[in-house]
């Protein structure tokens, strides 16, 4: 353990020396990310921090080691900036009234959330529900109260199951889990089709090529693309789960 700590310290020192010119920028970016994170949590965003693992494979694809995935300061910084970019782009194009793909997370079903509230009462927890609806801030406060308790993992999973699945839509109806009025997937065009499609729209718009014909084209294309990409996402998640089971 001491040897690992020493290696980490030496690696950190080497990085600081190698990227010395960028350190002030990184520190400023970290400060900005903390402000963004605080603002997001204040409005009620829910952070499901489930433990994840990564499976190390050999050259033949056989598992040789399973390591916990560490969510460190760097990954959180990237996440905060990514979320801010996604929200900014979504709001900008919503007000421009241009056909677009949004990442939507609808409010939980009234009956599901009521059943969840009844269930957690058995563990001494409560959930404020007004007019059949719950604010994401209530879920956030519940998970905060349960943090560090034996039932934390169970309550987190039950809370997640009480919510609807996120999907792609052409209507901007907000993202419940992030407590965001505007949200899209913009930051990963190299690995997600919705992001790539959005980049195409943005590029055409910036170059002044979004005339009536192109707007009509996207108006017809995007509803089908939203349904198709949402269904592909479900299949990809299922394939990922099955692969992890097989490798473990």
Predicted regions and their residues:
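Conserved, carboxylate-rich catalytic/transport cores that coordinate ions
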Residues: 1-248
């Amino acid at each position: 353990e001491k040897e690992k700590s020493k290696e980490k310290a030496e690696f950190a020192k080497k990085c600081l020396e190698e990227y010395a010119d960028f350190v002030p920028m990184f520190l400023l970016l970290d400060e900005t990310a903390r402000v963004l994170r605080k603002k997001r949590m204040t409005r009620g965003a829910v952070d499901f921090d489930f433990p994840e693992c990564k499976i190390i494979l050999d050259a033949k694809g056989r598992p040789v080691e399973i390591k916990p995935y560490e969510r460190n300061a760097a990954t959180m910084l990237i996440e905060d900036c990514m979320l801010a970019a996604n929200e900014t782009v979504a709001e900008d194009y919503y007000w421009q009234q241009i056909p677009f793909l949004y990442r939507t997370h609808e409010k939980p079903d009234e009956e599901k959330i009521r059943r969840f509230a009844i269930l957690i009462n058995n563990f001494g927890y409560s959930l404020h529900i007004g007019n059949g609806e719950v604010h994401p801030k209530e879920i956030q406060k519940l998970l905060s109260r349960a943090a560090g308790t034996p039932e934390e993992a169970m309550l987190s999973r039950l809370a997640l199951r009480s919510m609807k699945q996120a999907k792609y839509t052409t209507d901007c109806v907000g993202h419940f889990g992030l407590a965001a009025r505007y949200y899209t997937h913009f930051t990963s065009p190299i690995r997600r089709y919705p992001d790539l499609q959005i980049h195409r729209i943005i590029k055409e718009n910036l170059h002044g090529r979004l005339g009536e014909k192109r707007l009509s084209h996207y108006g017809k294309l995007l509803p089908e693309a939203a349904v198709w990409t949402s269904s592909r996402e479900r299949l990809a998640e299922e394939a990922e789960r099955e692969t992890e089971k097989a490798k473990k």
